[in-house]
Regions:
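Generic alpha-helical structural context detector
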Residues: 15, 53-56, 73
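Short beta-strand segments at enzyme active-site cores
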Residues: 42-45, 120-121
């Protein structure tokens, strides 16, 4: 069986760069290593844009812009989804039906658009299911 793609949200990418909690960070890195090894990681343009913005401002210490740019370039191998109008319509539907903030709904809609049934997130509730997409917290669920 071919491994299924797994969508990764901004919170997971940020945590992978934050050295404040090394044991938990290692759990996140184990997931990312698995996704690289199987070539099944997926992201969206939104996730990478948010990662760039937050990694250069939110984590302590902030990452140098050049380092974040290099990471964003590396994640281009994960086929970043560019949300189109159909993705936005799907996100609006998820927002209405599940009460999700629009940014989170757009992440879920992008995961759906890429055929992902699993979404790695530290921001959404573990094991929540939005349509066909199940949220997995990488600190709770092993790869």
């Amino acid at each position: 069986l071919k491994p299924e793609p797994v969508f990764v949200d901004t919170s997971v990418l940020l945590f992978s760069e934050d050295g404040a909690r090394p044991a938990e960070r290692e759990q996140v890195l184990a997931w990312l290593r698995q996704l690289w090894a199987t070539r099944t990681g997926r992201v969206s343009v939104q996730v990478l844009n948010d990662f760039y913005l937050l990694a250069t401002r939110q984590i302590s210490p902030p990452m140098p812009q050049g380092d974040v740019r290099a990471e964003v370039r590396r994640y281009q191998h994960w086929r970043p989804w560019s949300p189109d109008q159909a993705t936005v319509e799907s996100a609006w539907s998820l927002e209405s039906r599940f009460g999700l903030p629009f940014a989170d709904a757009l992440v879920v809609a992008s995961a759906k658009a890429q055929g992902c049934t699993r979404l790695l997130s530290l921001a959404l509730p573990h094991d929540a299911v939005y349509d066909s997409v199940q949220v997995l917290n990488p600190l709770v669920s092993a790869p």
